[in-house]
């Protein structure tokens, strides 16, 4: 069994098309210990080198991490999490993407970016970032334009508007 999982940052991202809120906000204890472990275990079997841009390019000067996509239709825990997130919004389930699980090893990063492509008519409007563990160094989500950074504890979520040009780090 790969024990490096205990020393890396796992973040789970879900995107929704939902109404605009002012600032990023932390939602405490959204995921249980068991849900965090289940998502880590399930994702670890599907991880691939993360890509950037709509062309799915691999560019480790911009992003160095691994990504797994989890479908609600294939896993009841994932389905429950998506429904929990939808319940915190006024948007329908059909507007939700699959879960994107990111694994950052020591030295991993994602340079400032937006979670939406401006030319897309079906742009992501909001992002939920979940911390699946808290045994890591670094790993803050930074918003340079508002001079704020967030470090989540296991089970917490960070919820923000992707269209506000925060340029997350």
Please annotate each region the language model reported.
Residues 1-159, 163-169:
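Fe(II)/2-oxoglutarate oxygenase catalytic core
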């Amino acid at each position: 069994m790969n024990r490096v999982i205990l020393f890396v940052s796992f973040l789970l991202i879900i995107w929704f098309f939902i109404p605009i809120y002012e600032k990023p906000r932390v939602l405490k204890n959204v995921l249980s210990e068991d849900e965090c472990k289940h998502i880590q275990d399930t994702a670890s079997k599907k991880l691939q080198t993360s890509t950037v841009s709509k062309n799915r390019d691999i560019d480790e000067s911009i992003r160095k991490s691994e990504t797994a996509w989890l479908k609600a239709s294939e896993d009841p825990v994932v389905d429950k999490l998506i429904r929990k997130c939808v319940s915190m919004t006024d948007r329908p389930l059909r507007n939700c993407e699959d879960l994107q699980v990111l694994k950052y090893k020591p030295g991993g990063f994602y340079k400032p970016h937006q979670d939406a492509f401006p030319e897309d008519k079906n742009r992501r409007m909001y992002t939920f970032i979940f911390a699946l563990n808290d045994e890591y160094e670094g790993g803050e989500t930074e918003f340079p334009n508002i001079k704020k950074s967030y470090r989540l504890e296991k089970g917490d979520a960070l919820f923000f508007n992707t269209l506000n040009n925060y340029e997350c780090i």
